[in-house]
Amino acid sequence: MVELKGTHDTICAIATPVGEGGIGIIKISGPEATAIARRLFMRSGSGSGLESHRLYHGWIKDPVTGQSLDEVLVGTMAAPHTYTREDVVEINCHSGFAVLNRILELVLREGARLADPGEFTRRAFLNGRIDLSQAEAVIEVIRSRSEQGLLLANRLLRGALGEKVRSWREGLLELQSRIEATIDFEDDLDEDALCAVSDRARFVTRLDGELIPALSAALESAERSRALREGVSLVLAGKPNVGKSSLLNALVGRDRAIVTPFPGTTRDVVEDTFLLSGILVRVLDTAGLRHDPDEIESFGIARTIQSLEEADIVLCVMDRSRPLSAEDDAVVEAVASRPFVIVLNKEDLPPAISTGKIRERYGENVPIMAISALRPPDVERLRDFLNQRFLRLPLEQSGSAIVPNLRQRGCIEKALQAMIRARDLISGGGFWELASTELRTARNELDSVLGWNGDDALLDRIFSDFCIGK
């Protein structure tokens, strides 16, 4: 296990956002945590002891001046049953810049040092309470912006990914040990024993029938369920003045974009978010696509094209009260490579085009929704349609989905490729030594998911994303 420099000292940090509020928390972890608390905290009532995992009322006082700073609640937690597996103290005081920083100064003066970003969680990892995939899940929980994202992050925090990776790793270790036995003891084994440990078909069956499908399925599931973790991007595209901005405002439930009767009001991409079945939807209102934009509008259209290329879903918005035009054709052509829905807006006005005309022009299987962005029931129908058509599958899988982050997916992908190379070597009669090397590579990649490979630079990069106090 990697050991971080300074892990035997005592660290402290403000664990809550600094500002005016009801409660602020200062966290202390390390061998001197409880001793520091005893020197600063005067318990109310007749008692003086601080039992583990109990909360005590009292006052923080400067031991030098005797000045009382704040009325607090102090909790002490003895190792190893703590977040870091070290002695931990949490001082719950009033939240204000002056009081939090003054108490922190006293804790530092009594011998603690200021924690680095993520150092409490890093100590939890280094002390074996969590693996690296769980440590990374902490930041996922903090940054979750949707219910589904939170549920997935919580699943990782509870160790679901680490459990799978450890089982794959054990399977690899067993295969590799048999191969090493074949290599090391080939001259010492009789023919029957040698056949038993070096049966190539058995190795291939184990890889093809168990390990390779398991990793492949995990990666495929992660890709299918990506929307649950990362959300989806929904781009509103169309020619000018078809009601894209009105639709954006209706979807997010507030006046986010400027709406006027004049074409070309939206000159740049306007972005906001809303939740759909617990999934974060990032909706982008884009500049209208037309043949003769002015110079400023051209920049907005360039960004529109980029947004379309990156979109998960496109709503191709058309004005039902106006005849189809070459500009509508250009919009459909621009979005044809992405999952899209034609939204016939302004259904509250006399129609100039029909769904039949749309299908005749753009194809029988083109999905179409006729709505008015000004009517809430219509917008709700559109939400339901998007939910059923694009989000139903990931939501059905959400109960068991384990979605690793980008780094973890990269490690699993590399492990899978190494297993495939090992399989091909074994089935093709290649050298056992080369197959063993590939299996070792696969195991090292899985070790990286768990943080078992002693990579300090990797740990520094991961924990630098954390806030101080976590």
Curated annotation (Swiss-Prot):
Mg(2+) binds at S245, T266. Residues 231-391 form the TrmE-type G domain. Its cofactor is K(+). Keywords: Cytoplasm, GTP-binding, Hydrolase, Magnesium, Metal-binding, Nucleotide-binding, Potassium, tRNA processing. Gene3D superfamilies: P-loop containing nucleotide triphosphate hydrolases, Probable tRNA modification gtpase trme, domain 1, tRNA modification GTPase MnmE domain 2. Pfam families: MMR_HSR1, MnmE_helical, TrmE_N. One of its GO terms (molecular function) is GTP binding. It is found in: Cytoplasm. Coiled coil: none annotated. GO terms for biological process: tRNA methylation; tRNA wobble uridine modification. It comes from the Bacteria. InterPro entries: G_TrmE, GTP-bd, GTP-bd_TrmE_N, GTPase_MnmE, MnmE_dom2, MnmE_helical, P-loop_NTPase, Small_GTP-bd. It is an enzyme of class 3 (hydrolase). PROSITE patterns: G_TRME. Its EC number is 3.6.-.-. (6S)-5-formyl-5,6,7,8-tetrahydrofolate binds at K27, E90, R129, K470. Belongs to the TRAFAC class TrmE-Era-EngA-EngB-Septin-like GTPase superfamily. TrmE GTPase family. Homodimer. Heterotetramer of two MnmE and two MnmG subunits. HAMAP family: GTPase_MnmE. This is tRNA modification GTPase MnmE.
